[in-house]
Structures are given as structure tokens and as C-alpha cells.
Amino acid sequence: MADLSLLQEDLQEDADGFGVDDYSSESDVIIIPSALDFVSQDEMLTPLGRLDKYAASENIFNRQMVARSLLDTLREVCDDERDCIAVLERISRLADDSEPTVRAELMEQVPHIALFCQENRPSIPYAFSKFLLPIVVRYLADQNNQVRKTSQAALLALLEQELIERFDVETKVCPVLIELTAPDSNDDVKTEAVAIMCKMAPMVGKDITERLILPRFCEMCCDCRMFHVRKVCAANFGDICSVVGQQATEEMLLPRFFQLCSDNVWGVRKACAECFMAVSCATCQEIRRTKLSALFINLISDPSRWVRQAAFQSLGPFISTFANPSSSGQYFKEESKSSEEMSVENKNRTRDQEAPEDVQVRPEDTPSDLSVSNSSVILENTMEDHAAEASGKPLGEISVPLDSSLLCTLSSESHQEAASNENDKKPGNYKSMLRPEVGTTSQDSALLDQELYNSFHFWRTPLPEIDLDIELEQNSGGKPSPEGPEEESEGPVPSSPNITMATRKELEEMIENLEPHIDDPDVKAQVEVLSAALRASSLDAHEETISIEKRSDLQDELDINELPNCKINQEDSVPLISDAVENMDSTLHYIHSDSDLSNNSSFSPDEERRTKVQDVVPQALLDQYLSMTDPSRAQTVDTEIAKHCAYSLPGVALTLGRQNWHCLRETYETLASDMQWKVRRTLAFSIHELAVILGDQLTAADLVPIFNGFLKDLDEVRIGVLKHLHDFLKLLHIDKRREYLYQLQEFLVTDNSRNWRFRAELAEQLILLLELYSPRDVYDYLRPIALNLCADKVSSVRWISYKLVSEMVKKLHAATPPTFGVDLINELVENFGRCPKWSGRQAFVFVCQTVIEDDCLPMDQFAVHLMPHLLTLANDRVPNVRVLLAKTLRQTLLEKDYFLASASCHQEAVEQTIMALQMDRDSDVKYFASIHPASTKISEDAMSTASSTY
């Protein structure tokens, strides 16, 4: 109609004659030429000519169009090197355009043009470095904000794709950025330049960052005039630390970080709190423990609520940086090798190289060049799977991961037994075994000397200096009895490798000296531990008199001068006290095995609370983490603080190790009963990871009750448990695992019936659970759920359920005898193959199709048990069933060799059925019965059919 109206208007303009080329009176036909019949001037121009024409246009949009079409122009002239260079020269002129939108449009195209130049480098060498990079660098200081932003994005994109040569980065990019961050530079430009420097540091590497970027970055951290600059530095501090490495971080960056953490602007301090974990990862354990911990405590107690909030969110990740294999107890062991073979291999491996922390070695095998700060003795593995082995091993081979402090303070009993085993129990070897077999560098010694003065060392009663050899000769009088170690292990003496540091009288003196400083949380914790030890030792004094005398004699004979390289760190003072306490009471001993932890029920609740002292992380940090469940924190810090605590808990648990799980147990139970479902949901999604960390014994004792509670929680919480149901149940003992068979049915019931994804996830998990249960359990408990899901209202749930049923058929048929498999097939035929509803009969065809595709049944068995019932559906009254049957027979069944090679009666029956379907009255049935199997995908067609039956 629009064309007719235009035609009428043109006819009325007779005077002009415009638009009328010819008029034939005979045919009365008006011929109107199209605009395509004319050749425009632009088409007559070369690509370079069009570029020049529009680049010189006064119309801004034309110049923008030129910038947008530069890449296409380059592609047109890429065969001619001169034309390519000419286009690049036009780009340089276009970069001087006075209109900011044109410059911004040009900068958006630069990364694409640079990539093109890189791909065509032989024809246009150095094109990017000569023509494009100077424009990008110049625009970093452009007056227009949009142009600067696009140039910054372009620069980062070019660096990320490695399109800028290293030489150009050093000579063209970095000098400009350093100039832009000069004191007299524009404030906005300076802030943006600092951000660019920080973001490009990981891309350019350590060398360039350390030489060119780091000095200016340190200056910007101290920018007194612009807090925005300091805030950018603080926000990117972790990235810079991770690039430059540990030495540069500790020497140059940490002093600036301390200044930023005490900045008078709360936004700067908040940025420091957010990147604290990354900074911690770039420092050594000693600095992390002695300096960063105290700094972090200051941030947690910051006057600004926003700083405290960020600090508490980073607390869990920061604690996780203290993790190492010796404290977490997580390391790999090849189950196929015996303990003796592992020890021999480790001994050979550690002769020529420094032993890593996650390698199992005996104490006598520890190389002498290990430093105290990084060494850890991991003895023979006594995880729960090897508890029976551990009971028959010497005490010196118990698996106890030790940190550097415990390495210097191994118990005399453990060393005596180790010496007896290796040196025929000669008395002269006690001294050599007590002497540390690790060396310290001069730097480590200096640091340890500085930390020797602390509250514990200052107020404690000095240990007596007694000659060890003389006292041993007086008390032993000769060789120790070969039965000595066995007798000690049978008595009430604890098997912990710790030194008894004081007698009961000395403990009382320690408490008396510490009481004036009870305001200090660390001192208070020490006093509580010592008090509990005194009470416990007095209760059991009449039972342990003999064993305590023996141990106190050995303790009095320990000469401190024999341990010149063993200093005690400030943070290690608390665990050493607790170690002494644990040695004085058999109920307070250091445990690594899961079975011991789960069976150790001699603590009263008060005593267990008082003994939450560990040596993996500074106790003050752990106390702050445990306080995150305090209701007052939600009011004074963050309403989501409990959720952050729950999110970080698996990492904290891994850091502390399963031997310190008692420190977190109460907190975990508090979080599991939190009123906010988001907190419980977070725990539900990670409970399987925590179970791996704790092992089966602790999981059964502490996690299973909470897991059971989650099963009855809201759907938002239950989905977290359901998504990792297999991962959790496989860690449980078979008897405990079978208890959940009765509860799987409950997952079919949801708060909202429309929550079909819940049922789909259940089907996915049931497929994985098949391997955990016996054929009888699968048939009795999982089969009803699977058949229920096959009849679900939602096609996606049904589709996964078909896979579940087929895997179930495979497992049950492979069992001996295959009775359960035959019964399941008969039930499928009865409930689905002969179902009065057409959707049930369609489901039967889907199951048969999946069984064939996944080879869940041998074809001869399929032909006997399922195929006869499948072929009867060729006469089904519903076309959808016949369509799916035609697809299954033609595209799946006939692809199997069994039906291609053999000329059996089964093959004849299939061919007759297909011929009948080819003559079906429904066109779709005819099509799929006649189509070649390779011309379409069965899964796509099947899914389309399934979705049509929602």
C-alpha cells in the first residue's frame, strides 16, 4: 500500500516528470527504476578513497562510522602492504579528532585491529608498535573521561592477549604510567593510572613489576594528599604481593601495608581487610603468625563497623593461610604399599633433597638441612583405616603431625623408644635423640631470639639445668629394659610425643605468676588450662603416682643447654603449656587417630571448653572466629556474619586438623541450629567436605546428627544435602549408611510440588548411590523411588529417571543370581508396558531405548525379556507411542550388531514390526520408521517428544 501511495503522489507531479521514465499507451504500464539501478559515487571509490572522504566529513556520525569500519577496510586491503600502511596512517590522523566520541569509538576498535595486525604480521611488521600503541598510551591522559576509560580497557585487553611486546611495555607503557602518577599529576588521572599499574602487574610478570612498578606503587601507598590513591593501592595490595613474591613483600610492601591498615580513612582500612588473605599468602609462616595476626586483630576491633565487617568476612580465609599438611593431617598414602616399604622409600627420597611437609618420614630420617620454621615430622600413618596396625607399632611410629615447635620438644618417652629400636637400646643414645636433628639458619635464629621474650617465658619458673647423662646413669644404672616401652604403653602413660615441662608444684607457681595478667585473653586461657590440669592430676594422683614419678624424673633430667637451636615462639607458648598438661593426665593427651578422638569421652563439658587450645593458628584469631556466632556480633558488625562463619568453616577445620575438631564442634552445632535458613543452607552444601576432613569416626559422632536435622529442614536447606548425598554417604560405615535407605523416600515430598529440580537432583543422586548398596537394598528401597520418578509430571525428571532405571536393571541383572533383575523387568512391563495411560507406555519405550543405548542388558537377554513387550506397542492407539517405538527400533535397536549379524527369529520380528510401522496411518510414524538411522539424532528427537508430553 505504501508503494501505491508513493506512485499516486508521483503521478500528480506531471510538471516535474520526476520518477517517470517511460509511458506506454498500449500497455498502460509505468516503469519506475529502483535506486539500485544507479551506481553511487561511493561504489566508484576505492576503500582508501571512501576512508578519506568520510574521515574529512564535518558530520560527527560519518567520522564515527569511519572508526567503526576501520577493521573492515583493513581486511579489504590486507593483500597490499602499502594500502595497509596507508590505513594505519589514517588511523593516526583520526586519533587527533576533536570529538571525544570519535576518539572513544576509535579506541574500542584498537584491540581488534591489533589482533588483525598480529595475524598478518609478515605483511605489516611492527604495525601495532608504531601506529596503534602510541595512541593507546596517549589516550591514558586524555581530558575526556570516556576516552580514558576506553583506552584503559584497551590496554588491559592488549596485555591480556599478549599483543604488546615486552620491550614496548618497558619503554612505552610503564614510563607513561609512572609519569601519570607523579605528584603534580591530575588527581583523577593519577588514581586511574595507579589502578592500571596494579591490574597490569600480573600480566607483565615479576621482573617488570619489581623494577618499574613496585617503587612507584610504594610511593603511592604513602600519598598523604589523596586518600583515593591509597584506597586503590590497598584494594590491589594482594595482587602486587602475589606477583613480586615473598622477599619483596616482606622487605618493601609490608611496612606500607601496616601504614595502610592504620590509615585515618576507614575506606582504606576496609580495603586492607578485604585483601588480607592474599597478603598473608605472600609471607612466611613466622611473619604471618607474629605480625599479621596482631594487625588483623586490630582490624577486627576497628572503630568503623564497615572495617569490622570486612575483617570478619576475611577472618576465615586468613586462618586458612596457616594450613599445612602436618597440622591438617591430610596427605596421600598408597594403600597397596606396606608401612615398612613406605618408610624405606621415604628414607631414600630424603637423603638427597629436603623433605616436603606432606611426606611421611621417621624422626631419625629427617635431613639435617631442614629449617625449624618449615619442618614437620610426619610419622607412620595411623588414620582410622589403619587403627588395627597402629596398636601393634612402637610408640615412636604413631602418626602425629608436628609443627616446628613440637619438633624441638618431642617427649622423652617417644625418643627413648625410638632410640631403643634403632640403636639396641643403648643409654648413651638418649642424649643424641633428644638433641634436635634440624638446623636453623642465622636469620631464623635471630627471629626466634627476638620472640624468646614474651609473657609466658617472662613469668614462668625457669627449668632446672641438670646434666642429662649423669642423671640417666644414676637412675638407670645400665641398659634400659627391653620391655620398657611395652610396659609404658600398657600403663596409664599417654602416648603423646610431648615434653612434660613442669611438676605439679611448678604448675601452681605458673598460675600464681600469671594471675596478675589475667586481663590478657591469652594469659586467661593459659590459666584455665593449667587449673584444669591441676584438678585432673589431683583426682588421678593415686592411680598415676608411679608413672608421674618416672616422667618427672625424665623431665628434671632434661638439660635445656642441649637444645641450642630450639627457641619457643610467642604464639607457640600456649600449646606447649597444654602439651605439659596433657602429659600429666591420661585423659588429656594429644590424639591424631579418629577412633581415639571419637572414643575420648572423659572430658566434662567445662573441661572440654577450657581445653580449646591449639598451636596451628594464633589462639586470638581462633577466638575471634568462634565469636562470630555470638548474637551480639550480628547487631554490632553484620547481620550476615553467621553466614560468613559457616562459609569459612570447612577451610578453618582443614587448617586446624581433625585433632583440633573439638575447638570447632560447639560452633558448628550453633551454626547448624541458626535461625537463618541461609546459614544452615551454607553448612548443608559443605557438610560432605567437612566429612572428608574429619574422617568416618568423627563424622559418625558429630556430623551425622546434624545431617539428619538437615534432612528434615526447609527445601532450601535439603537441596544442599541432596546435591552431595552420595559424597556424604560413601564416607559412612556400611551399617550407618543403610539407615538412610529408609529416609530416601522422604525426598519425594517437597514444600512446593512445582520444585521439580529437587526431584531431578534426587534421580541424579540415586544413580550414584547404586554403587553403595547391595542388590537387595537397591531392589527393596531404591526401586520404588525410581519407578515413582519415571511417572513424574515433568519430562526432565522422567528423562533422568529412565537413566536411573536402566542403570538399576544393569546392576540387578549383573548380580548373582539375577533374580532381582528379572523381577524389576517384569515390574516395568506390568506397570509401564501395559499401563492404561499412554504416557506410561511411552515411558516403557524410553526405558527400553536407554537400556539398549547404554548396553545395560546383553542383547540376547533383552530380546527375551523386553523386546516382545516392546513390539506389541506397534498397535498402540496413541501415535506418540508408535512414533517413539519407530525411532527406537530404527535408530537404536537395528544399530546393534546382534540384530545386524544374526538371522534369528528376533531379527525377523523386528523387521516385520518396522514394515508395519512404515504403513502406519500416521505420517510421523511412517517417516521415523523409514528414515535412515544416521540421518537424525535419537536423543534430540526423543527429547522433543518427551517435552511435548509435559
From Swiss-Prot:
Pfam families membership: HEAT, WRNPLPNID
Molecular function terms, GO-annotated: protein phosphatase regulator activity
Compositional bias per record (Basic and acidic residues), positions renumbered to this chain: 332-365
Modified residue annotations for Phosphoserine: S935
SUPFAM superfamilies found in the cross-reference section: ARM repeat
Tissue-level expression: Widely expressed with high expression in cultured mesangial cells. Isoform 1 and isoform 2 are expressed in renal tissues.
Gene3D superfamilies registered for this protein in UniProt: Leucine-rich Repeat Variant
HEAT repeats: 1-25, 26-63, 65-81, 82-119, 127-164, 168-206, 208-246, 248-285, 287-324, 505-542, 568-606, 698-734, 799-837, 861-898
Gene Ontology biological process terms, A to Z: protein phosphorylation; signal transduction
Protein keywords: Phosphoprotein, Repeat
Keyword Phosphoprotein in record: yes
GO cellular component: cytoplasm; protein phosphatase 4 complex
Chain residue ranges for the region called Disordered: 326-374, 413-438, 473-499
Function: Regulatory subunit of serine/threonine-protein phosphatase 4. May play a role in regulation of cell division in renal glomeruli. The PPP4C-PPP4R1 PP4 complex may play a role in dephosphorylation and regulation of HDAC3. Plays a role in the inhibition of TNF-induced NF-kappa-B activation by regulating the dephosphorylation of TRAF2. (Microbial infection) Participates in merkel polyomavirus-mediated inhibition of NF-kappa-B by bridging viral small tumor antigen with NEMO.
Assembly behavior: Serine/threonine-protein phosphatase 4 (PP4) occurs in different assemblies of the catalytic and one or more regulatory subunits. Component of the PP4 complex PPP4C-PPP4R1. Interacts with HDAC3.
Protein name: Serine/threonine-protein phosphatase 4 regulatory subunit 1
